[in-house]
């Protein structure tokens, strides 16, 4: 949590938990203070003339004279927590991840069940996604129908990606597996270039499609979509699928109306096999919401951040109050 004026505070994920051993010292000091205070009170009761004492100091604030010591102990506890180094989850923009946007450009994308058409809506939302993706992400673009083509290799140049999106052209057949395999190859290539240390950069495939794979006819074939999804899982690349369209879509082929209903189930299985996530959208507005969700997932990562500042400031504040209370109540520091 974050408190006004104090900053982030957390009581978990301590980087230096051994600092809590200092609480033994704090407890010992508190115990010593109590022992000294009780002994002092006994001496006063034994030797003091109570009638004279009451006449000299009848309104002495006995109940409050321990407040400075209490505040001092509290401040030491708070400062100990700060020194132990609590942490909290912090979302920061990624700066070396790879995202491959894989878009289906088969003839079914001509369907107008989504205005103005499935492809036109996909182009508009995909360009917005490219604009809003965090700048450090390397974004690539693949278009696929019967075959897959890398239109833009992963790059931080968003204008190149948006220009290529505008130029997408429809083609025959749907080879979803080819699109996924091509994306994996592009990720491996760029990973060898921008990878830092011994591990490749984190990567993800965003697969945008409206229908069932037609080439090959069996998605479990070596070049099929399900085989590609399993390969993606083995390579640690989850696939986020977006099934776009309605059950009522159709296209005109040779002056005949051909139904092209969206196939949510196949895309969901691709996502499940790759340990990714499946999304559905049946309008441009829903598609924008899906892309916004993905942007938050892909563009940021959660790391451990410092959460000791709030404890440090609160401890310093209580320590200052202890000193002030000592001056006002006893005209001296507690002890």
Curated annotation (Swiss-Prot):
Pfam families: BatA (PF07584), VWA_2 (PF13519). It is found in: Cell membrane. PROSITE patterns: VWFA. Gene3D superfamilies: von Willebrand factor, type A domain. SMART domains: VWA (SM00327). It is a multi-pass membrane protein. The chain crosses the membrane at residues 18-38, 67-87, 309-329. One of its GO terms (cellular component) is plasma membrane. Residues 98-294 form the VWFA domain. Keywords: Cell membrane, Membrane, Transmembrane, Transmembrane helix. Belongs to the UPF0353 family. This is UPF0353 protein Mkms_2500. It comes from Mycobacterium sp. (strain KMS).
């Amino acid at each position: 949590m974050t408190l006004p004026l104090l900053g982030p505070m957390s009581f978990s994920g301590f980087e230096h938990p051994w600092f809590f051993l200092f609480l033994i010292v704090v407890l010992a000091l508190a115990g010593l203070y109590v022992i000294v205070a009780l002994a002092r009170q006994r001496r006063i009761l034994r030797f003091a003339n109570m009638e004279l004492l009451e006449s000299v100091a009848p309104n002495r604030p006995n109940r409050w004279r321990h407040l400075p010591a209490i505040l001092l102990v509290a401040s030491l506890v708070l400062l100990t927590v700060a020194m132990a180094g609590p942490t909290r989850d912090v979302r920061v923009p990624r700066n070396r991840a790879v995202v491959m946007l894989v878009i289906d450009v088969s003839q079914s994308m001509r369907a107008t069940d989504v205005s103005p058409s499935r492809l036109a809506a996909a182009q508009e939302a995909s360009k917005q996604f490219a604009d809003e993706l965090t700048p450090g992400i390397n974004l690539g673009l693949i278009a696929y129908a019967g075959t897959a083509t890398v239109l833009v290799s992963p790059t931080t140049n968003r204008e190149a990606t948006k220009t290529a999106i505008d130029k997408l052209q429809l083609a025959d057949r749907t080879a979803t597996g080819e699109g996924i395999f091509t994306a994996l190859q592009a990720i491996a290539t760029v990973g060898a270039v921008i990878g830092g240390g011994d591990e490749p950069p984190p990567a993800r495939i965003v697969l945008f499609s409206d229908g069932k794979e037609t080439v090959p006819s069996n998605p479990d074939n070596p070049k099929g979509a399900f085989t590609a999804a399993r390969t993606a899982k083995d390579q640690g690349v989850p696939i986020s699928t977006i099934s776009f369209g309605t059950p009522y879509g159709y296209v005109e082929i040779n002056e005949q109306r051909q139904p092209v209903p969206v196939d949510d189930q196949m895309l969901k299985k691709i996502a499940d096999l790759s340990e990714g996530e499946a999304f559905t959208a049946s309008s441009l507005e829903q598609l924008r919401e899906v892309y916004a969700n993905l942007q938050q997932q892909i563009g940021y990562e959660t790391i451990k951040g410092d959460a000791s500042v709030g404890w440090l400031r609160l401890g310093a504040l209580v320590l200052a109050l202890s000193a002030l209370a000592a001056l006002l109540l006893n005209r001296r520091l507690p002890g």
